[in-house]
């Protein structure tokens, strides 16, 4: 498969716009849409406990999708629970482990987290009287691993992002995982910005819980997320949601939960979403995760070089080996929304604002950034067009000063 030409053929929108908003959501290739269409047109039915042929087919495809997801991140089949998105997955972890914490216990995270990997721990700390500590780092988002080792000592739980959605920094999650396991703490990984962009192996990361969304890196639909639950926690993690599908037996006085993964999926799941996610992962595997990572690195390199040439400030690690396909920048004195509007006039889609990472913006003393984020279907030609628009904008601003 030629990168990115053959991928672009499967995504008609790439012929109409320059789409640099992949951190928010990726575009959807035809095979994903076709897989979901097949479900809705040929075997639309609810899963589990149905004896008719449509339900049997839907159940088979749904569970096959779980296997595809599990294999992709090197997990076991029953360690995968489908959710709505990363945010829900992380909230479920905090709620399901709440009973393990007592007053004075320590949770450790970083100051660079997406709100979805910060607020659940803030709420839990407030509710249970816990200590919430943050691993120190610099303005590029690089963590101080010596400080991490100190902070992790005595921690009950450590929750970190794999890749920053605001700065693009790739954290040393594998190294952090070793520290956490040496301490005997629980390790939670927010992999929303890494799955589908780089290799993610739950065993290498030593993750106890790992969360991601289908609509980002994996190029699946919205409304489907994943929560990996290490089987060592099956009897410890209390499902926050129970009801239909989660039980083995019910009396008027009490109930008995069924085995995982069904016990973690209350009610009718997003069947079409799971099937679409699996199709997206198969598409990613067909391309090759190494080729995706290589293409994104090329795009980041040229983008940051171009911004430097234009003397436009950008944020994140200068060491591009630690920089994922996310480049945040500003064009002073313009507000990020104004820059994004100018780019939109040229059919270039970027994100602007605080990116659900207000502590990061406050640390940098800015009200937000413009964020260009890439996937395998983006091209160097698109980057040059993007830089050309910024060059004209900068010239206009500087000539009027």
Curated annotation (Swiss-Prot):
Enzyme class, spelled out: transferase
GO BP of this protein: cysteine metabolic process
Modified residues (N6-(pyridoxal phosphate)lysine): 216
Keyword match Translocase: no
GO MF annotation list: cysteine desulfurase activity; pyridoxal phosphate binding
InterPro entries the UniProt entry points to: Aminotrans_V_dom (IPR000192), Cys_dSase_SufS (IPR010970), Cysteine_dSase (IPR016454), PyrdxlP-dep_Trfase (IPR015424), PyrdxlP-dep_Trfase_major (IPR015421), PyrdxlP-dep_Trfase_small (IPR015422)
Catalytic activity: (sulfur carrier)-H + L-cysteine = (sulfur carrier)-SH + L-alanine
EC number: 2.8.1.7
Keyword flag Nucleotidyltransferase: no
Keywords noted in UniProt: Pyridoxal phosphate, Transferase
Cofactor: pyridoxal 5'-phosphate
Family: Belongs to the class-V pyridoxal-phosphate-dependent aminotransferase family. Csd subfamily.
Name of the protein this chain belongs to: Probable cysteine desulfurase
Source organism of the structure: Pyrococcus abyssi (strain GE5 / Orsay)
